[in-house]
Amino acid sequence: MQSNPVIEALLQRKSIRQYSEQDPSDEVVETIVRCGQQAPFAAQLGSLLLSRDRKKNAFGAPLLFTVLVDVHRLERIMARRDWDRSASDAAILLFGVQDAAYMAENMVIAAESLGLGSCFLGGAPFQAERIIEQSGLPSHVLPLVQLTMGYPAETPPPRPRFPLPLTLFEDRYPEMDAEMIDQAMAVMDAGYLAQDYYRRAGFMVPLGEEREETFTFDDYSWTEHMGRKWGQWLRNPRELLDPLKHCGFDVSGQTKADE
């Protein structure tokens, strides 16, 4: 595999949850945000909230960005040209999520190049009501993800990733046989156990009453963790649809003509 400083930084990227007392300068923050702005696409459906309050920010981070899907701003611009949005909420959200996600990842890469670390927090959509109240977000703005950032006070190893054959498919999606899946599971579980990841985190996803706990931190690893998360969480679609509606987005499939 080829290598250069950018590739090395990307391959060594890991989540940072402990930060030094050094605060990033305004110039550093502006540089990171400008790099985020250069991400695709042309509609620029991403914007940012920034908190510098360490006492309130997750992990005591000096910077907490809330990455927004910002359809409101586009609608204001369209209105000045005497246009109303015809795209459905579901469609515009799909494109907005892409814009905002690319923006956030550009920021992470820029931050890494400047010696900062970061950690994504995926629960922002489910905290939409609180974020709206605290930050005065208008309708048609969705908190997509939060991003802590600052100078690292820890050096954890990069987390394991799937083998390339389970990620890169040329021309056609493969039929994933048991051997292919088992090999990938073995790689992921061995990698996380070698790092003692879940023991150090002190966390195992609790089981529902219908299942008996048989794992300890000696054998609890990534595949069991993912199974428990996505086999138990968010069963009711209202858990996501309600926050979206609170942000002014109706993705129920009902059109204005149906109302």
Regions found by a protein language model. Give the residues of each.
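Acidic, surface-exposed loops and disordered segments
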Residues: 1-259
